[in-house]
C-alpha cells in the first residue's frame, strides 16, 4: 500500500483504504465514494477499470493523460506558491492554492508511476 494522493491514487490504495481494486470490488464497497480532485477522480476510474485484477492498457493511457493534464507549468506553480504566501488572502484561498499545487505534484508521480507499471503489465 502506498497512498500517493487523495482517496484513490496509489498502488493498492482504493477508496481511502489499503485495498486493491479487486478487493474493494469484492467487498461491495462504493465506487462513487468522493474524489477530492480531477486527478483523484481519474485514479478512481482507473481502479474501477482494473477491478477484475487485470488492468486494460487503455485505462493506463487514460490515467496518464488525466495526470499530465493536471501538472502545472513551472511558472504557474511558482505563481501559485507566491500567491499562497500572501498574508492578505483568505484561508480558503490559501487552502485552495495549496491543494492545487499538491495535486500537480501528485499528478507528476502518478503519470510516471503508471507509465513504469504499464511497461511491466502482462495484460
Predicted segment positions?
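Extended terminal accessory/targeting regions
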Residues: 1-123
